[in-house]
Amino acid sequence: MVMKENEMKVVVTGLGVISPVGNSVAEAWENIRNGVSGIGPITKFDASRVDSKVAGEVKNFDIKNYVDFKTSKRMALFTQYAVAASMDAWKDAGLDACESLNKDRVSVML
């Protein structure tokens, strides 16, 4: 493939997962390989008044493993999942230890 002069390369170097099948890349991949479903009865709220009684809920997630309590209280649950997955991807990429990192050249995509 020939790249044009104004095109930039994108490199995926780290992964993070918070999902109904696992809260880490290793756990999610293992469950996917073993055919484990993340779908089950709704437990996060009273589903008696909605048509569907099943969903893919994230289990055993603790935002306090990622941010302090005060910060977590200002985040919606879906934002907590995104922040946690992003932080895991950053760590997986080895960027924690990269002191010479040009932050203008790095991003986390969700």
Predicted regions, residues:
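Conserved "HGTGT" condensation-loop signature of ketosynthase/thiolase-family condensing enzymes
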Residues: 1-110
